[in-house]
């Protein structure tokens, strides 16, 4: 029997999302106009809370859909205007170009990155050294590339290796279903569980590595570019200004990596079973024998393009997005990727998040028009200049751990810049606050998958169910990093940031906005 029209519409609305989630969004959409008529300020804050809710519930439904509906309604009822949204998008065009072109560009360098991580996995036998190598490699790559792409590469390595061993363990060849363990011998199951634990720990180390490296440079995370643009910093300026906080945090993060592996705390410490290593080594040997001269040239070309990418970013030869576009052109032209559909696949990872970021800017426009953060900013600015840094760091960290750090970073840097332009704070203080905001949004956000896009990508990937990586387990395994990164970051903002910045300014290392 066919369902009713009403039931059909309900099923189509937000698709497979739970009924309670659909109902909650409908309630939001119904009550918002009435609350806006009664009190625009409260309605604005309610909209922000609703939007954060959609980000927190990203596993129920991709936030672009519910967040987009809320943003469209906000424009319709007059909380902001389409013209203001366009202005916000135009002001942040560099970030959108970064996401569109840089992520797509790195897609065409995946073979090189896969080669690097595969060699790491099979050539290093010590689990502690291997974990450290994955963390350092992810941190270095994320300082120049997009963290999402780095995690995507590590995921593809892990899925590939898991599939190879699972096929051997199940004896089902190409017909093997990686989610089905029913055909696996009990002995193999024990080895498989150990292998899952090994992959879980490596993925978490790599994920945290992207946060450690991503906070250090203006291209490491999307919000970094927004903050750098607001402060007028180039690549070198940004790195130096962040270093009083980010370098100690990096060192302590790597020490934490070694400690949890050594002590086998928080689900870490599992080693790669020898039986699995033998299977993977055989597969890698076969792959290397099959690698043609053409394949080897592709790897060399990608490595040269990687050098160009790092050089162009460091010397600020063009806007970040345009450098990414040059990577796309060079990588496709020199490796023989000429089909439109093959090129189009490179954009599938970045465009949904680019669209979501545009929705962010709509909510930012509402925040500006309704002066939502004015009371918070006034409260913070009433404190001493020294205390302001700590408060900005903590407020950013708290919000970033439950919401998306791009959203939070954009809001706070806009408010801090407005305060400087209004004469409430000095230029010198604004530049210190920009560092506190950047580190506050990047470091504590490793607490949950909601804060780091790369973590959320890992949680929603095909790998997560294979290695039994749930939301709760991810939060638990991230906990030691969350504590160390947040506390060390706070101490550095409190004690080392101002004196180190002053020393670098006097030494002539730092340029200042005029």
Curated annotation (Swiss-Prot):
Molecular-function GO terms, alphabetical: sodium:proton antiporter activity
* Record has Cell inner membrane as a keyword: yes
Q: What organism does this protein naturally occur in?
A: Salmonella newport (strain SL254)
Q: Which PANTHER family match?
A: NA(+)_H(+) ANTIPORTER NHAB (PTHR43302:SF1), TRANSPORTER ARSB-RELATED (PTHR43302)
| Membrane topology listed for this record | Multi-pass membrane protein
Main localization of the protein described in the UniProt heading: membrane
InterPro entries referenced in this protein's UniProt entry, alphabetically: Na+/H+_antiporter_NhaB (IPR004671)
Q: What NCBIfam families does the entry give? A: NhaB, PRK09547.1
The entry's function note states: Na(+)/H(+) antiporter that extrudes sodium in exchange for external protons.
Q: What is this protein called?
A: Na(+)/H(+) antiporter NhaB
Catalytic reaction(s) noted: 2 Na(+)(in) + 3 H(+)(out) = 2 Na(+)(out) + 3 H(+)(in)
* Key words of the record: Antiport, Cell inner membrane, Cell membrane, Ion transport, Membrane, Sodium, Sodium transport, Transmembrane, Transmembrane helix, Transport
UniProt KW Nucleotide-binding keyword: no
Its subcellular locations are: Cell inner membrane
Q: Name one GO cellular component term.
A: plasma membrane
Q: Which family does it belong to?
A: Belongs to the NhaB Na(+)/H(+) (TC 2.A.34) antiporter family.
């Amino acid at each position: 029997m066919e369902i009713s029209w009403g039931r059909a519409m309900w099923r189509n609305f937000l698709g497979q999302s739970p009924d309670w989630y659909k109902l909650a969004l409908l309630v939001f959409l119904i009550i918002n106009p009435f609350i806006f008529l009664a009190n625009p300020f409260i309605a604005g804050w309610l909209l922000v809370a609703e939007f954060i809710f959609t980000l927190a519930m990203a596993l129920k439904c991709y936030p672009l859909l519910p967040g987009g509906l809320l943003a469209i309604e906000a424009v319709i009822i007059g909380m902001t205007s389409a013209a203001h949204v366009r202005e916000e998008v135009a002001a942040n065009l560099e970030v959108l170009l970064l996401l569109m072109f840089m992520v797509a560009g790195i897609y065409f360098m995946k073979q090189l990155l896969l080669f690097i991580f595969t060699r790491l996995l099979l050539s290093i036998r010590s689990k502690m050294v291997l974990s450290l190598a994955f963390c350092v490699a992810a941190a270095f790559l994320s300082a120049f590339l997009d963290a999402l792409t780095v995690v995507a590469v590590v995921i593809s390595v892990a899925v590939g290796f898991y599939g190879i061993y699972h096929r051997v363990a199940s004896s089902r060849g190409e017909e093997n279903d990686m989610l089905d363990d029913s055909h696996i011998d009990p002995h193999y199951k024990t080895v498989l569980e150990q292998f899952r634990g090994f992959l879980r720990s490596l993925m978490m180390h790599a994920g945290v590595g992207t946060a450690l490296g991503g906070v250090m440079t203006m291209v490491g995370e999307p919000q970094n570019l927004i903050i750098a643009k607001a402060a007028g910093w180039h690549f070198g300026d940004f790195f130096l200004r962040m270093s009083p906080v980010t370098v100690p945090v990096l060192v302590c993060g790597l020490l934490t990596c070694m400690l949890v592996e050594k002590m086998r705390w928080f689900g870490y410490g599992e080693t790669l079973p020898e039986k699995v290593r033998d299977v993977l080594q055989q597969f890698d040997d076969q792959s290397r024998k099959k690698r043609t001269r053409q394949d080897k040239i592709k790897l060399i070309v990608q490595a040269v393009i990687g050098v160009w990418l790092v050089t162009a970013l460091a010397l600020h030869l063009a806007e970040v997005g345009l450098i990414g576009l040059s990577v796309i052109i060079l990588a496709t032209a020199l490796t023989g990727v000429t089909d439109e559909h093959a090129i189009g696949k490179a954009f599938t990872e970045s465009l949904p998040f680019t669209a979501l970021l545009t929705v962010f800017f709509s909510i930012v426009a509402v925040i500006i028009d309704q002066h939502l953060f004015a009371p918070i900013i006034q409260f913070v600015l009433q404190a001493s200049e020294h205390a302001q840094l700590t408060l900005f760091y903590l407020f950013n960290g708290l919000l970033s751990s439950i919401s998306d750090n791009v959203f939070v970073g954009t809001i706070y840097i806009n408010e801090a810049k407005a305060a400087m332009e209004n004469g409430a704070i000095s230029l010198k203080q604004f530049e210190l606050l920009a560092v506190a905001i950047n580190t506050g949004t990047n470091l504590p956000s490793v607490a949950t998958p909601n804060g780091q896009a790369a973590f959320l990508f890992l949680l929603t990937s095909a790998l997560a169910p294979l290695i039994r990586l749930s939301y709760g387990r991810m939060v638990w395994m991230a906990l030691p990093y969350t504590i160390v990164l947040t506390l060390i970051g706070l101490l550095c903002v409190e004690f080392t940031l101002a004196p180190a910045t002053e020393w670098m300014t006097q030494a002539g290392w730092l340029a200042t906005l005029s």
